[in-house]
Amino acid sequence: MDRYAVVGNPIAHSKSPQIHAAFAHQTGEALGYEAILAPLDGFVDTVLAFRAVGGRGMNVTVPFKLEAHALATRLTPRAAAAGAVNTLAFGGPETPDDILGDNTDGAGLVRDLTVNLGCPLHGRRVLLLGAGGAARGALLPLLEQAPAALTIANRTAAKAVELAAGFAAGHPGVAIDGGGFDALAGRRFDVVINATAASLADQAPPLPAGIYAEGALAYDMMYGRGDTPFLAAARADGAGRLADGLGMLVEQAAESFLLWRGVRPDTAPVLADLRARLAAA
């Protein structure tokens, strides 16, 4: 049986083993999937040890995505653009030293938005909040959907400006700009995506009022039993639709499964089961 794992620190909270077990059962793929706690200074050793005992691939979570990027011997275009890796695929007998690094986070976000939520991004005005790793990982897949405009806003404006400039040249058909939260005053957006960690601190990004266009979607990469602080603030400010990041979690896992096994699982029943468990917790 082929072995896969998710590696991180901490890792006990991870839903990845449950998700991939459901995918394997649904598709009839014979595989095992486990969670591995790596020491903060022992990521590379942990990965290589897992590969040495027959591991075929790994998901990578906090805080090791940059180290995974450095460890990979080759990168997918979306991983190169993200500057971080959340999925590793190990080479077979002919290429034992090959480690492919991929980043499925942004693709998972886009699939959740466009397929699960029925929210097309083409021609829309998109606002991405944050300029860290989560935001960077989402940018290329978002831009590939050809929105009319994509604005990056961050507490430190210079980081948003720099991130926007790094992607603007490759996407001349999209109006890309970056700045601070206060620069959003008087502007309106069709899709607002929170890629900041503010919800972890039980806070919402300090956004000016009135940024949501009629029927706009507010999307938080974080998730919980109820509204996150960002979604609660969006509801109060008139967002037409609200969504959290549980679907993104399932869809990025499906992208990893597709990379490893060559088959895309049906995510709808897995997402519904996770949502029910979360509500009952």
From Swiss-Prot:
- InterPro entries documented for this protein: Aminoacid_DH-like_N_sf, NAD(P)-bd_dom_sf, SDH_C, Shikimate_DH, Shikimate_DH-bd_N, Shikimate_DH_fam, Shikm_DH/Glu-tRNA_Rdtase
List the SUPFAM superfamilies hit by this protein, alphabetically: Aminoacid dehydrogenase-like, N-terminal domain (SSF53223), NAD(P)-binding Rossmann-fold domains (SSF51735)
Keyword Nucleotide-binding part of the UniProt annotation: no
Q: Name one Pfam family in it.
A: Shikimate_DH
Keywords noted in UniProt: Amino-acid biosynthesis, Aromatic amino acid biosynthesis, NADP, Oxidoreductase
Top-level enzyme category: oxidoreductase
Give the residues the record marks as binding NADP(+). G130, A131, G132, G133, A134, N154, R155, T156, A157, A158, K159, M221, G245
**Pathway assigned to this chain's UniProt record:** Metabolic intermediate biosynthesis; chorismate biosynthesis; chorismate from D-erythrose 4-phosphate and phosphoenolpyruvate: step 4/7
One GO BP? amino acid biosynthetic process
User: What are its E.C. numbers?
Assistant: 1.1.1.25
**Substrates-to-products reaction catalysed:** shikimate + NADP(+) = 3-dehydroshikimate + NADPH + H(+)
| Catalytic residue list | K65
Q: Which residues bind shikimate?
A: S14, K15, S16, T61, N86, D105, Y223
Q: Name one GO cellular component term.
A: cytosol
State the Gene Ontology terms under molecular function.
NADP binding; shikimate 3-dehydrogenase (NADP+) activity
The similarity comment for this entry is:
Belongs to the shikimate dehydrogenase family.
Biological role stated in the UniProt entry: Involved in the biosynthesis of the chorismate, which leads to the biosynthesis of aromatic amino acids. Catalyzes the reversible NADPH linked reduction of 3-dehydroshikimate (DHSA) to yield shikimate (SA).
Assembly and partners are described as:
Homodimer.
According to UniProt, the name of this protein is: Shikimate dehydrogenase (NADP(+))
Q: Which organism is it from?
A: Azoarcus sp. (strain BH72)
Organism lineage reads as: Bacteria, Pseudomonadati, Pseudomonadota, Betaproteobacteria, Rhodocyclales
